[in-house]
């Protein structure tokens, strides 16, 4: 006789869908690297290194996820990024 251990993992629906949103910033021909870096530091609480790396990814790949969190926390940050002239959206 063999015994099999049955394991059930309970994951609540809220847990599974809580942090599925992210802010994506897109490349444009208008904003300078310095403006993008300063804005990411101010709005998204990036370190200077994070902001610089994100700006390079945005430039070379056309877009970069700069923040991941619940929608309610991302919405005001995305609005600030848009107000600063960056192309951004929550996905």
Question: What would you call each of these model-derived segments?
Answer:
Residues 1-91:
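Terminal domain-initiation and capping elements
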């Amino acid at each position: 006789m063999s015994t099999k251990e049955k394991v059930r993992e309970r994951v609540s629906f809220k847990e599974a869908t809580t942090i599925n949103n992210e802010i994506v910033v897109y490349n444009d021909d208008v904003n300078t690297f310095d403006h993008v870096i300063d804005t990411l530091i101010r709005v998204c609480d990036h370190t200077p290194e994070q902001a610089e790396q994100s700006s390079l990814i945005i430039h070379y790949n056309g877009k970069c996820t700069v923040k991941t969190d619940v929608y309610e926390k991302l919405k005001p940050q995305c609005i600030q990024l848009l107000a600063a002239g960056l192309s951004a959206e929550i996905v």
